[in-house]
Amino acid sequence: GIKLPILILTAGTEMYPEVIEYSLEPGMPNVASLQKFSEVLKSQGISKYPVHVKFDTGMHRLGFMENELPALKDFLNAHPEVEAKSFYTHLAGADSPEHDEFTLGQLSLFDRLTNDVLSAIPYKPMRHAFNSAGIERFAEKYPQYQYDMARLGIGIYGISYVDDKNMKPSAFYRCPIVQIKTLGPNDGTVGYGRHGKLGPDGKTIATIPVGYADGINRHLSRGAASFEVNGHLCPTIGNVCMDMCMIDITGIDAKVGDTVTIFGDNPTANDLAAILDTIPYEIYTSVPARVKRVVTGI
């Protein structure tokens, strides 16, 4: 099992008893959260429970702003139930060069705000600010902002903000071919809405057991995306169905049971994101729980 501490970035107040039960460490974005968590701790006779205090340096989603620091300092000094294990912030645009000045402003503000709080409490929490983009684009040039830790998020999956060649994918979405049909030019069409055209020479079609209920966006239909089969990229044909979709494997040596890569090293999650005008985060998080996860190589 996992032996290292687990930071819960956003734990709802109703989850606090479970957080304590499983020795998790919650993020604290405001005094109200600290007060509620402190009450739960006090009712259980617990002191110095580790929490992680979030600072809002420009994302404006969660966290303490500068005008709230006096209340934060007072709380940390007055409530022995909690002990700040770390201070952290989140960068809003570290992936985009156009926002580099803003990102550096966030880091500078975080430095100043946390130094203010550090000077007012009798212990020294760790600090962390870099996300995956921050690590890749700022860590080497601005080592002073590496602090004590960094939060590697989507980088764990091998996604790069500079060049995909810098990273090796660690997450693959794969499935088997479940049926193959060789269709002639007079065999009609493929899929719902009859959008899959066979052309004058016909096509060889492979059906795979994933559809839009499995995170395969319908905008990847009708050849918009291609999936890898035995080293070849095979375009979708017709509309993506709920639980299945079809790909064109004409001229490719393939059989039922062969593996199809939806995303991984080719195509990458970035490739699919570009087709859908979105980000790779959405590609990964769109894969629902019903899709089996297999962990290997540990």
What is each model feature region?
Residues 1-126, 142:
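Active-site-proximal beta-alpha core segment in soluble small-molecule metabolic enzymes
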Residues 12-14, 18, 30-35, 104-298:
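Active-site anion/phosphate-binding pocket segments in diverse small-molecule metabolic enzymes
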